C-alpha cells in the first residue's frame, strides 16, 4: 500500500487569520494568550484538513518563521537577546523584527534597542527566513517545548503525526558566522542536541520524523558532503525512523550521497527531479522508503493525474509498501483553498489546485495505485477534461504577442549612449545635489487607503470618488516629502495593493484570486497573480497617477514600475512554455509603459527588479542561461528612452558578489539595494568589481520599527564611500515603506535627509 504524507501546510489561514492576529498583538490590541489560542485553532483546522493523509506534519506551523523556531529549539539565540527572560514568543519577535529603545509598540516591554535579525530568501522562493547567527563560541541547548506542545495537540486530535525539523547540516549552511568563524566547526556541538531532540520525540511515541536537508539539491564541496556523512552517522543510532527530505531541485552529484546516508527514507522532488527517480530506486537499500513528490508544491496548476499515474504505476509495482507519495515540497508556497474563489473566472478556476485541492489530488493518486483506477474514474475523467480545456483554450495563446516576440533583436535592449554620456545629460536636466535622497517607492498603506480600495472593489465607492481619494493620498505623500526636503520624490503608490498584482490586473494574460495569499515573511502576505496566457498591455497603467503627482511639485517625480523579471518571479507562472518566453512578453508590455511615461514628461523612471536574484537556479552551472534572458528582459524594458531620462532599478534581499557583472550589464543609471541588515556587507562585491554607474545602498531597515539615528546613517554611508565614489552615491531606505506607519517613516526620513546634508558638508 502506498503511504501518503505532506511536507508542510500553509500556516497563515485561508483568509490570513494569522496575519491579522499577529498585527493585533503587535499593536497591543490583543493578548499573548489570544494569539497563542489563534495558533492552536489554525493548527487544529489544518490537521483536520489533512485528515485523509497517512502521516500529517507537525512543527511546520510557526508564528513568524520555521528557521527562527528551529534556532529557539536548538537554544541558538542571538547574543543581543540572550539577557531577555520573558516569553519565548516575544523573544522570537525581538529577533525577527527588532525593537527600538523608544518603541511605541505594546509588548516592547522595556527591552531597550534590539537590532532585527538578518532576513533572506528561502532558496529560490519568495519566502524569507531569519538567518541563524553563529560565533566560534556558540553553544546549543535543547528546548523541545514548541514541538512537544504541537505533538500533544495533534495526538489529542487523533492525528498520526510526523514532526518536521530542519536538518543539522542545512541549519548550519543557512546561517551566518558573525565573527567569520567556520560554521561547520559547530557541528560536533550541534549533533548531540539533535540526538536529544530525536530521543525526546521517541519517548513521546513518534515513529517517523521528517528531517529537511534541501541543500542536497545545491552544489556542495567536499567539506559539506562529509558533514552529511558525519551528521547522519551520529544520528543513525537513534531509535526513530528518519525521512530525509530534499526539494526545490535535482540531487545530481549529491544523489549517491543522499542514497547512502543511514536514514529510513528519502523524499525527492519529482517535479524538478523526475529523471533521478530510477537512479534512486537502483541505489537505495532495499528496505528504504522512497517518497515521491509527485504534486507540485510551488505552483497552482492541476496535476495531470492520468499521465502521473502512467509514470507511478510501474514504480508502485516495483517498490510496493516502500513507495510514499507527497507534494514536491511544503505547501507553504501555495494558497490554502480554491473553494473560496467564487469570483475567479470559471474556466481558469477549473485549471487550478490550491493546497487543499493538491491533497485531494494526492488522495486520488494513492487510491488509484492502491485500489485501481476504476475506483476514482470520475475524478480522473474530470481532471483529464480540465487539462485538455487549458491546452486548447484560445485565451492562453495570442498570435500577435507571439509575433512580437519573434521580432525581438539585440538592438531593442541598447541605450543610445554609454553611461558617462547619459550621466552628464541627466545631471544637467535634474540638477541634484551630492548624495541625493529618495525613497524606494511606496509610503504607508493607511487604513483610509485600504478602506477606499475595499469600497471601490465592493462597488460602494464609484470611480470618481476612488480617484479623488487616491489623489488626496498622493498629495499628502508629495507634501510630506517636500517638507522632509527629499530630492527625488515618489507618488507613494496609494493606488497599488501590491507591486506585482497592480500591474497584472492591467495586463491581458493574467487572472486574479480573491484569497490566493501566501506568506512572504512574518505577517507579510502576498497574493501572486496568475499568469495563464500570452501577455500584452491594452492601455497605459501608471501614467495618470504619476503625471498627477508631478503636477504637484517642481522636484523630479519618479515613475514607478515593476520589472518583468520580478513580475515573473512573483507570479504563479504558466508551466506550458519556458519562463524566458513569458519574461520577454512582460518586457515588451512594460517597455510600452516606460515610453509612455517618458512621453508624458517623466524624467526619472524606476523599474524594480527586487526578485532578480530569486530566480537564479540553485546550481551555478545553470545561472548563465537564466541571467542572459533576465538581463535581456530588463534591457528591453528600460533602454528605449532618451539619454537624459534617468533609469533606476531596485533590488532587495540580494547578494551581489557572484552576479555583479550581470547587474552592471543591466545598465541602469542608478541601482538601489538592501544593505542595512548586513551592515553594508553586500557592498563587498564592489571591492573587486568597479561598478560603473550610480548606487543607493539602503541605509535603514524598513522591515523593523526601529528609527535609525543620523549618526548611524552617516556611518553606513562612509562605509559605502570607501567602495563607491561619493559622487555616484544616493541615500535611501532599503525598501518601500508600505508596511510602516507614518509615525515611523517621518522621523526615519528626517534623520536620513539630515545625514545626507552632513555628508554634503563633509565632502565640500
From Swiss-Prot:
Pfam families: Meth_synt_1 (PF08267), Meth_synt_2 (PF01717). It is an enzyme of class 2 (transferase). L-methionine binds at residues 440-442, 493, 608. Zn(2+) binds at residues 650, 652, 674, 735. Its EC number is 2.1.1.14. Pathway: Amino-acid biosynthesis; L-methionine biosynthesis via de novo pathway; L-methionine from L-homocysteine (MetE route): step 1/1. The active site is at residue 703. The keyword Metal-binding applies. 5-methyltetrahydropteroyltri-L-glutamate binds at residues 16-19, 121, 524-525, 570, 614. CDD domains: CIMS_C_terminal_like, CIMS_N_terminal_like. GO terms for molecular function: 5-methyltetrahydropteroyltriglutamate-homocysteine S-methyltransferase activity; zinc ion binding. L-homocysteine binds at residues 440-442, 493, 608. It catalyses: 5-methyltetrahydropteroyltri-L-glutamate + L-homocysteine = tetrahydropteroyltri-L-glutamate + L-methionine. Its cofactor is Zn(2+). Binds 1 zinc ion per subunit. One of its GO terms (biological process) is methylation. Catalyzes the transfer of a methyl group from 5-methyltetrahydrofolate to homocysteine resulting in methionine formation. Belongs to the vitamin-B12 independent methionine synthase family. NCBIfam families: met_syn_B12ind, PRK05222.1. This is 5-methyltetrahydropteroyltriglutamate--homocysteine methyltransferase. The lineage of its organism: Bacteria, Pseudomonadati, Pseudomonadota, Betaproteobacteria, Burkholderiales.
Amino acid at each position: 500500500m502506498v503511504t501518503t504524507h505532506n511536507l508542510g501546510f500553509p500556516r497563515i489561514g485561508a483568509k490570513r487569520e494569522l496575519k491579522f492576529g499577529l498585527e493585533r498583538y503587535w499593536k497591543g490590541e490583543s493578548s499573548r494568550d489570544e494569539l497563542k489560542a489563534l495558533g492552536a485553532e489554525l493548527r487544529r483546522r489544518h490537521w483536520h484538513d489533512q485528515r485523509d493523509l497517512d502521516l500529517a506534519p507537525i512543527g511546520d506551523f510557526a508564528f513568524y518563521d520555521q528557521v527562527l523556531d528551529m534556532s529557539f529549539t536548538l537554544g541558538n539565540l542571538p547574543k543581543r537577546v540572550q539577557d531577555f527572560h520573558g516569553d519565548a514568543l516575544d523573544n522570537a519577535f525581538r529577533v525577527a523584527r527588532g525593537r527600538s529603545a523608544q518603541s511605541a509598540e505594546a509588548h516592547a516591554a522595556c527591552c531597550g534597542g534590539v537590532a532585527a535579525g538578518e532576513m533572506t530568501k528561502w532558496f529560490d522562493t519568495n519566502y524569507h527566513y531569519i538567518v541563524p547567527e553563529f560565533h566560534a563560541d556558540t553553544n546549543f541547548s535543547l528546548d523541545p517545548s514548541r514541538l512537544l506542545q504541537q505533538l500533544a495537540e495533534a495526538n489529542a486530535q487523533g492525528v498520526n503525526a510526523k514532526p518536521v525539523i530542519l536538518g543539522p547540516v542545512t541549519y548550519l549552511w543557512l546561517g551566518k558566522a558573525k565573527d567569520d568563524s567556520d560554521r561547520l566547526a559547530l557541528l560536533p556541538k550541534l549533533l548531540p542536541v539533535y540526538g536529544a531532540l530525536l530521543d525526546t520525540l521517541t519517548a513521546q511515541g513518534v515513529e517517523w520524523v521528517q528531517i529537511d536537508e534541501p541543500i542536497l539539491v545545491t552544489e556542495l564541496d567536499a567539506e559539506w558532503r562529509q558533514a552529511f556523512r558525519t551528521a547522519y552517522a551520529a544520528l543513525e543510532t537513534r531509535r526513530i525512523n528518519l525521512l530525509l527530505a530534499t526539494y526545490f531541485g535535482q540531487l545530481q552529484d549529491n544523489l549517491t550521497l543522499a542514497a547512502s546516508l543511514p536514514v529510513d527514507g528519502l523524499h525527492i522532488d519529482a517535479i524538478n527531479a523526475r529523471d533521478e527517480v530510477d537512479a534512486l530506486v537502483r541505489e537505495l537499500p532495499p528496505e528504504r522508503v522512497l517518497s515521491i513528490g509527485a504534486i507540485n508544491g510551488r505552483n497552482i496548476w492541476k496535476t495531470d493525474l492520468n499521465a502521473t499515474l502512467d509514470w507511478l504505476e510501474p514504480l508502485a509495482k516495483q517498490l510496493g509498501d516502500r513507495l510514499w507519495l507527497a507534494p514536491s515540497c511544503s505547501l507553504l508556497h501555495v494558497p490554502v483553498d480554491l473553494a473560496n474563489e467564487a469570483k475567479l473566472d470559471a474556466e481558469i478556476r477549473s485549471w487550478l489546485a490550491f493546497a487543499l485541492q493538491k491533497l485531494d489530488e494526492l488522495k486520488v493518486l494513492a487510491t488509484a495505485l492502491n485500489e485501481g483506477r476504476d475506483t476514482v474514474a470520475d475524478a480522473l475523467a474530470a481532471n483529464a477534461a480540465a487539462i485538455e480545456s487549458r491546452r486548447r483554450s484560445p485565451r492562453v495563446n495570442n498570435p500577435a504577442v507571439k509575433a512580437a516576440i519573434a521580432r525581438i533583436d539585440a538592438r531593442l535592449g541598447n541605450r543610445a549612449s554609454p553611461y558617462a554620456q547619459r550621466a552628464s545629460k541627466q545631471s544637467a536636466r535634474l540638477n541634484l545635489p551630492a548624495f541625493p535622497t529618495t525613497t524606494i517607492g511606496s509610503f504607508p498603506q493607511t487604513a483610509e487607503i485600504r478602506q477606499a480600495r475595499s469600497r471601490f472593489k465592493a462597488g460602494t465607492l464609484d470611480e470618481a470618488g476612488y480617484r479623488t481619494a487616491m489623489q488626496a493620498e498622493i498629495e499628502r505623500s508629495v507634501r510630506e516629502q517636500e517638507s522632509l526636503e527629499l530630492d527625488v520624490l515618489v507618488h507613494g503608490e496609494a493606488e497599488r495593493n501590491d507591486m506585482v498584482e497592480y500591474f497584472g490586473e492591467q495586463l491581458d494574460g493574467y487572472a486574479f484570486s480573491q484569497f490566493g495569499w501566501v506568506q512572504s515573511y512574518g505577517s507579510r502576505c502576498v497574493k501572486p497573480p496568475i499568469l495563464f496566457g500570452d501577455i500584452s498591455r491594452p492601455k497605459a497603467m501608471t501614467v495618470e497617477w504619476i503625471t498627477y503627482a508631478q503636477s504637484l511639485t517642481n522636484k523630479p517625480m519618479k515613475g514607478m514600475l515593476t520589472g518583468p523579471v520580478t513580475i515573473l518571479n512573483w507570479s504563479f507562472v504558466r508551466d506550458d512554455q519556458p519562463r524566458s518566453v513569458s519574461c520577454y512578453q512582460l518586457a515588451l508590455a512594460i517597455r510600452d509603459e516606460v515610453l509612455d511615461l517618458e512621453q508624458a514628461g517623466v524624467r526619472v523612471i524606476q523599474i524594480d527588479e527586487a526578485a532578480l536574484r530569486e530566480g537564479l537556479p540553485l546550481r551555478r552551472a545553470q545561472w548563465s542561461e537564466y541571467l542572459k534572458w533576465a538581463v535581456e528582459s530588463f534591457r528591453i524594458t528600460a533602454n528605449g528612452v532618451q539619454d537624459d531620462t534617468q533609469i533606476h532599478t531596485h533590488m532587495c534581499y540580494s547578494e551581489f558578489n557572484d552576479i555583479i557583472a550581470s547587474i552592471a550589464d543591466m545598465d541602469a543609471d542608478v541601482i538601489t539595494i538592501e544593505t542595512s541588515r548586513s551592515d553594508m556587507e553586500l557592498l563587498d562585491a564592489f571591492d573587486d568589481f568597479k561598478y560603473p554607474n550610480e548606487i543607493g545602498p539602503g541605509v535603514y531597515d524598513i522591515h523593523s520599527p526601529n528609527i535609525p539615528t543620523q549618526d548611524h546613517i552617516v556611518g553606513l554611508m562612509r562605509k559605502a564611500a570607501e567602495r563607491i565614489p561619493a559622487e555616484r552615491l544616493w541615500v535611501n531606505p532599503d525598501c518601500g515603506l508600505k508596511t510602516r506607519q507614518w509615525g515611523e517613516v517621518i522621523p526615519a526620513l528626517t534623520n536620513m535627509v539630515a545625514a545626507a546634508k552632513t555628508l554634503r558638508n563633509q565632502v565640500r
